[in-house]
């Protein structure tokens, strides 16, 4: 299901138009709309909201790996605040770990990025099961509400997705 339009009059309910999985168009009316529709928010556009670009943009890499050998970590999330290489690291379960690193110019290998967490003579099995990149941009909407439509999560503000913080910020917005 994909929302294709959000419209509201001065008073009364909000009209939401959506397309179902078969391509059929439908409408429904709601007392309020919570626009949790991300960085490219249709709801933000519907209320006339625009981004303020805070001119901050960084590329990050996420690496999920399975390993049988020892990894230097503690039970929790490590947030590394090194200006040369900020990052986030956590144990997901007994054998799976996640690293997130800000990328610099010149692509480092996965082994170079995670070397600080592995002993020099690391002998365990190590398999990258997921590797992806994203670009974090700092942007803030000039409004979070228009009539009976409200913005939550990445629709009004972009948040780095460290360990689910993108989702968690949307829940905090709702509270």
Give residue spans per PLM region.
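Core Rossmann-like FAD-binding/catalytic domain of the broad FAD-dependent monooxygenase superfamily
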Residues: 1-175
């Amino acid at each position: 299901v994909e929302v294709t339009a959000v419209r509201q009059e001065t008073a009364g309910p909000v009209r939401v138009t959506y397309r179902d999985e078969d391509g059929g168009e439908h409408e429904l009316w709601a007392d309020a709309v919570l626009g949790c529709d991300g960085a490219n928010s249709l709801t933000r556009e519907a209320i006339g909201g625009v981004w303020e670009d805070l001119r901050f943009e960084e590329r990050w890499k996420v690496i999920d790996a399975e390993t049988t050998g020892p990894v230097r970590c503690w039970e929790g999330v490590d947030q590394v605040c090194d200006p040369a290489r900020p990052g986030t690291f956590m144990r997901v379960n007994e054998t799976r770990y996640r690293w997130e690193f800000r990328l610099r110019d010149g692509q480092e290998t996965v082994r170079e990025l995670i070397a600080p967490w592995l002993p020099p003579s690391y002998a365990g099995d190590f398999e990258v099961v997921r590797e992806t990149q994203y670009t974090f941009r700092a942007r803030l909407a000039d409004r979070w509400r228009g009539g009976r439509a409200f913005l939550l999560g990445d629709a009004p503000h972009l948040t780095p997705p460290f360990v689910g913080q993108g989702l968690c910020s949307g829940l905090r917005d709702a509270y």
